[in-house]
């Protein structure tokens, strides 16, 4: 056992940094979520008559064990934070090569399944968000069937928090969560074994060795960083409740009604999607617009070209004068992203637009005009244009 510990402790891979581990942090958090969620399942009481009582007491220990619920709740926050950082980092690096097409698509599909898992979980938590989340999920399901019949009844029954609904969503939440962990594992394998899309499998032994070393190094960095974070928060906060919603609630609507703050957990999970629904005049337009967003994100490698040869014909503007090509001729060498002025400017505006769109509060119909404003609409227009056309 000591030899195994020393092996992991001393193993280093020079090209793996902490900033490259957002995806790995996400997967590790999912594993913790499976453990805490399983413990919650052991103590779950699907009795709707208890919901008003626990809401009045502002505690849910009558439905679940409180510590595991707190751990599970904070884990969702971490998964969203890590997954958004991971996605934005990959968009910055333009990881759209032939070898990474499978890993990109499996990652986007995992991100979509994660939204479904959280939807089910928000209903099961039995807070003030449960009813509205249940209604939104049922309406989304109803929209795909063009409002014909009641196909949503199989999962959401009559859109009420009754015993039948809680049991069905509990099963759906557990099955989809374990399926998400399986997709995350496949995504990690796809991203490290980049020979997946190649017609031949040469160099398999060396790539497996690289995978083992990289994974060991990621585990080491993860646990070291986790220890420092634990010590920091142990010294800063005496009670674990201090890390609850307060860390996401900087600002008070009662003091400033027009404030645009980003951290109202758990509203901020779906704030970009909620803001999009505000901008759309019809509900079905907004739902299919969200579907179009995930389709665009899913086919990023196809939109930008998955062949290595495509990178030689791009018209780019960089800081370095030696890279500027005359008469748009192809450059025979690769261009660094850090020196690509065109990429830096377009990505900067992309981040600014991404920050502006979720600044609309989830109950934005009361604080912002329906349909948004010009800046809001332009931000969404730029986001879609960046994902579709910008290399």
UniProtKB/Swiss-Prot annotation:
An example Gene Ontology molecular-function term: metal ion binding
Cofactor: heme b
Residues annotated to bind heme b b566: 86, 187
Primary residence: mitochondrion
Membrane topology: Multi-pass membrane protein
Subcellular location: Mitochondrion inner membrane
Membrane spanning stretches: 22-42, 67-88, 103-123, 169-189, 213-233, 275-295, 341-361, 370-390
GO BP of this protein: respiratory electron transport chain
PROSITE patterns in UniProt: CYTB_NTER (PS51002)
Cofactor note: Binds 2 heme b groups non-covalently.
Superkingdom, taxonomy of origin: Eukaryota
Residues that, per the record, bind a ubiquinone: 192
GO CC list: mitochondrial inner membrane
Function text: Component of the ubiquinol-cytochrome c reductase complex (complex III or cytochrome b-c1 complex) that is part of the mitochondrial respiratory chain. The b-c1 complex mediates electron transfer from ubiquinol to cytochrome c. Contributes to the generation of a proton gradient across the mitochondrial membrane that is then used for ATP synthesis.
Family the UniProt entry places it in: Belongs to the cytochrome b family.
Additional record remark: Heme 1 (or BL or b562) is low-potential and absorbs at about 562 nm, and heme 2 (or BH or b566) is high-potential and absorbs at about 566 nm.
Protein name: Cytochrome b
Organism: Paramecium tetraurelia
Encoding gene, per UniProt annotation: MT-CYB
